[in-house]
Amino acid sequence: MYINTLFWKQNPTGDKKNQEEKMQKTLLSCLITTLLLITVADSMKDTSVRLKLAHRDTLLPKPLSRIEDVIGADQKRHSLISRKRNSTVGVKMDLGSGIDYGTAQYFTEIRVGTPAKKFRVVVDTGSELTWVNCRYRARGKDNRRVFRADESKSFKTVGCLTQTCKVDLMNLFSLTTCPTPSTPCSYDYRYADGSAAQGVFAKETITVGLTNGRMARLPGHLIGCSSSFTGQSFQGADGVLGLAFSDFSFTSTATSLYGAKFSYCLVDHLSNKNVSNYLIFGSSRSTKTAFRRTTPLDLTRIPPFYAINVIGISLGYDMLDIPSQVWDATSGGGTILDSGTSLTLLADAAYKQVVTGLARYLVELKRVKPEGVPIEYCFSFTSGFNVSKLPQLTFHLKGGARFEPHRKSYLVDAAPGVKCLGFVSAGTPATNVIGNIMQQNYLWEFDLMASTLSFAPSACT
């Protein structure tokens, strides 16, 4: 979870005042980034896990002023910055935009415990820990869904004196507090955007749907029972589905049972909650038949993130003059894909080349600075402007593959009648982050066994 950003959803009907009021209620913030899985040893034949994915901004309307908060969180997040078994079965989860919830994250649902309880979680490829809003012993009223640990037959805490707590979970912010041998291992999990979650670690069963239509139980998965959490990253959510490349992430658990691949297709970030696609762990017909481009996936260079080797950016037929060290992870650069970041962050040298290059094609539009929108290049947009006048932005990748995002993914709605170039300067040196808006309407497949990333344009239907 690197960056959160909010954008307006256009409303073509009604008078201008009503339009602005409605648009102020449909802001987008960064997705992000986590995914849901399903797994059980008894039903591993001819199946894969499939989860629906929805954008987080499809949940609760937010005012324009949140754009500044979200971008600020994105910048804070940025500053901090294999499984060998194959199966024809996979986990399948619904995946959709969070615009109706007032956020630019993407959501899915998971079922936790025995009996299983349903929770809406942020899909975050940059987070290692899966956690839900939870009460471990305490009782009390809650204004959102809560998992009550004492009502689950499969909930088992991790002890504070165990090797797991004292050593293995250190990267997941485990705490050294251990007043008694029976005390659970606690955590204070910190995100790069300033958000945080506190609670206790436990082993629990997650129930997921499979691509063959069946349900499966995934026992003994490490989860966080979060008694408190703060930060805009969790707006409209009951928790986080951690999909980073980590031994404790949901990705690790699902791919160990259903094959070392996972894939997703992010619907348009302005889509409502009734529009969704799927997050799939394991075999997927769509990724087998789609026209694909493939590039190496670096799983060790910038852990626990999914890094790719960008070698340059072009606008139209012109390659931009960007120093090679911008893309070199050994020099503090490099590039990751992050479902928990909305805008795309570029190191300063790349950022200046991209935004000034694109701005040359927008000279006929009036440049504006909408209040509360901390993006440098914004323009008063009229219906008469043809977006196709913008040159094709292309990320050139190692191995010859090219990622060509849709124009709506880098010229984005930011306020009524205002569009902005969807980039933020990350400083120097800096990790470049390709956010979820830039990824939208593409099918992405992460092959953790072959260390490759394959992708293709898609309507995500």
Swiss-Prot record:
Cross-referenced InterPro entries: Aspartic_peptidase_A1, Aspartic_peptidase_AS, Pepsin-like_plant, PEPTIDASE_A1, Peptidase_aspartic_dom_sf, Plant_Aspart_Prot_A1, TAXi_C, TAXi_N
All copies of domain Peptidase A1, residue ranges: 106-456
Domain of life: Eukaryota
pH dependence statement: Optimum pH is 6.
Keyword Ribosomal protein among record annotations: no
Any single GO BP term: response to sucrose
Compartments it resides in: Plastid, Chloroplast
A GO cellular-component term linked to this record: chloroplast
Active site: D124, D338
SUPFAM superfamilies (alphabetical): Acid proteases
GO molecular function annotation: aspartic-type endopeptidase activity
Enzyme class: hydrolase
EC number: 3.4.23.-
Cytoplasm listed as a keyword: no
Entry function: Aspartic proteinase that can use azocasein as substrate and regulates endogenous sugar levels (e.g. sucrose, glucose and fructose) by modulating starch accumulation and remobilization. Influences general morphology and development.
Family of this protein: Belongs to the peptidase A1 family.
Name of the featured protein: Aspartic proteinase NANA, chloroplast
Gene: NANA
